[in-house]
């Protein structure tokens, strides 16, 4: 499924705010000139923070951030991909797992 709209979610980053060789920042807006496709193209995120750990091992040094997708969004199961992503703020502690 692919749609255009505003979708809120969560994304996991390495301690230096990188993910898959791409540098992010918090806060920040990022765009890719791609048609998003889960597991293929775009910046990936999950609507629920706890779902992120289906794809990443829990590491207390990693960053978990609230994100908003503004562009096209592809969704498959509990994972989404977009071509326009805003990193809003870091979510600290284990409280994010309840989100």
Task: Give the residues covered by each predicted segment.
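Short, glycine-biased loop/turn motifs at secondary-structure junctions and
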Residues: 1-99
């Amino acid at each position: 499924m692919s749609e255009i709209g505003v979708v809120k979610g969560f994304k996991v980053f390495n301690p230096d705010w990188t993910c898959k060789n791409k540098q992010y920042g918090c806060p920040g807006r990022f765009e890719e000139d791609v048609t998003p496709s889960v597991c293929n193209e775009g910046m990936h995120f999950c609507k629920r923070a706890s779902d992120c750990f289906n794809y990443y091992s829990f590491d207390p040094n990693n960053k978990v951030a609230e994100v908003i997708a503004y562009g096209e969004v592809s969704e498959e199961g509990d994972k989404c991909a977009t071509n326009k992503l805003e990193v809003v703020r870091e979510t600290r502690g284990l409280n994010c797992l309840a989100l």
